[in-house]
């Protein structure tokens, strides 16, 4: 099982944020405890999240770049900007729901096309 952090930069007030998620809730909560992020900031969980954060499409934390560095040092795997979409697609495929599995596979196919397209562009 793995904890992941993506390579994005989203401004939030004076902070720059990215996403942290994991294969299991226990791993995710252990990582935020390790890096000093309060559990109350979890998003997408039906009971642990609060308010509008409960309705996020996947269970994750938005973390500051300083916490990202700590997460990587603690063993989190760095992904590209497609990491969260890839994760949710795989959840859909594993769900046992044929419609979700089909959507998940289409999403993985689209991600593969995007990655290929961007890897072919000169820097």
Residue ranges of model-derived segments:
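Catalytic phosphate/metal-binding cores of nucleic-acid and nucleotide-processing enzymes, i.e., regions
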Residues: 1-122
